[in-house]
UniProtKB/Swiss-Prot annotation:
It comes from the Bacteria. The gene is gcvT. It comes from Bacteroides fragilis (strain ATCC 25285 / DSM 2151 / CCUG 4856 / JCM 11019 / LMG 10263 / NCTC 9343 / Onslow / VPI 2553 / EN-2). This is Aminomethyltransferase. InterPro entries: GCS_T, GCS_T_bac, GCST_C, GCV_T_N, GcvT/YgfZ/DmdA, GcvT/YgfZ_C, TrmE/GcvT_dom1. The keyword Transferase applies. Belongs to the GcvT family. It is an enzyme of class 2 (transferase). The glycine cleavage system is composed of four proteins: P, T, L and H.
């Protein structure tokens, strides 16, 4: 299994470790619910060094990105970030990702750990524009410091005014005595906070500084288990569950990152435009349980009469709401807010209702 610069630290701290995307990663420390609430109410730290990072540079960088991504990269300026996806030729999604505009002809792509090799091969094989591509996935470490107290803790470690970094923007500067750290107002939790990118040799210095700065706020290390419950409470999609090679961005409710602007002829644009105009055969919805039960990936969604209408893609017990919540694809006629549906949980039909995420208000 691959490791991150923090793997030994996780083991020393007693984390429950498990393989994820080929990496030995911490799943939980004190427990998923405790960690979830720590992030919602205070500050927690996630090792997300397993994520992939590609640089796209040169005079052809923008043309390349306009072709392979769904969002309008031309709308970015240096210091801004965009959520987007790589559409494939069959109407599905290769991956969802973030695009950082670093300089006028320099972009950073941050991709899912499970898709690094697939995404890299996709970029290489579609680079007919001649953009300069560089895979820096093994040369970057990343911590996500999340929660309402994150800004107070991190402000102690930099002269950059973190209040001047709005959501989905970033600055590059000195942090904890290390130069060229990317400080990004992003996250996968809905609790606020920052993501830090730095060289692996600075990893332990930055970890120790962050935990020292956050001690007065009860800072804790957080595992991937709580990362999943936090993102699901916000209704954020997870690749491999809610998105995959067969789900289109229009079906997944990602029309807002699919921009049909003049001159942007991205992969499979015409099919996605047709879907936007004519509708899709299924839609991703959020739902919460009426009956007691925890929905899980793969459970069937049915009508009260037992007719199959879809499938659960993500589900959990909400630590905040203390009810079962989930997402899944249903036939469009069952996607309206307030529609009652059923989840087939091992032969038991349990009632749920379609709602608009986030589940955590």
């Amino acid at each position: 299994m691959k490791t991150t610069p923090f793997t030994e630290k996780h083991i020393a701290l007693g984390a429950k470790m498990h393989e994820f995307a080929g990496y030995n990663m911490p799943i939980e420390y004190s427990g998923i619910i405790d960690e979830h609430l720590t992030v919602c109410n205070g500050v927690g730290v996630f090792d997300v060094s397993h994520m992939g990072e590609f640089w796209v540079k040169g005079p052809h960088a923008l043309d390349f990105l306009q072709k392979v991504t769904s969002n309008n990269v031309a709308a970015l300026v240096p210091g801004k970030i965009q959520y987007t996806c790589f559409p494939n030729e069959d109407g599905g999604i290769v991956d969802d990702l973030l695009v950082y505009q670093y300089e006028p002809e320099k972009y950073l792509l941050v991709v899912n750990a499970s898709n690094i090799e697939k995404d890299w091969n996709w970029c290489i094989s579609h680079n007919t524009e001649g953009a300069e591509l560089e895979n820096s996935s093994d040369n970057m470490a990343q911590l996500a410091v999340q929660g309402p107290k994150a800004i107070q803790a991190l402000q102690k470690l930099t002269d950059i005014n973190l209040a001047d970094i709005p959501y989905y923007t970033f600055k590059v500067g000195e942090f904890a005595g290390e130069k060229n750290v990317i400080i990004s107002n992003t996250g996968y939790t809905g609790a606020g906070g920052f993501e830090l990118y730095f060289y692996p040799d600075a990893a332990m210095k930055i970890w120790d500084a962050v935990f020292e700065a956050g001690a007065e706020f009860g800072i804790k290390p957080i595992g991937l288990g709580a990362r999943d419950t936090l993102r699901l409470e916000m209704g954020f999609c997870l690749y491999g569950n809610d998105l995959d090679d067969t789900t289109s961005p229009i079906e997944a409710g990602l029309g807002w990152i699919t921009k049909f602007v003049d001159g942007k002829n991205f992969t499979n644009r015409s099919m996605l435009e047709k879907q936007k105009a004519e509708g899709t055969v299924r839609k991703l919805v959020g739902f919460e349980m009426i009956d007691r039960g925890i929905p899980r990936h793969g459970y069937e969604l049915t009508t009260a009469e037992g007719d199959k209408i879809g499938v659960v893609t993500s589900g959990t017990m909400s630590p905040i709401r203390k009810i079962g919540i989930g997402m899944g694809y249903v036939k469009p006629e069952y996607s309206k807010i307030g529609t009652e549906i059923c989840i087939d949980m091992r032969g038991r039909k349990l009632k749920a209702v379609v709602v608009k995420p986030p589940f955590r208000k």
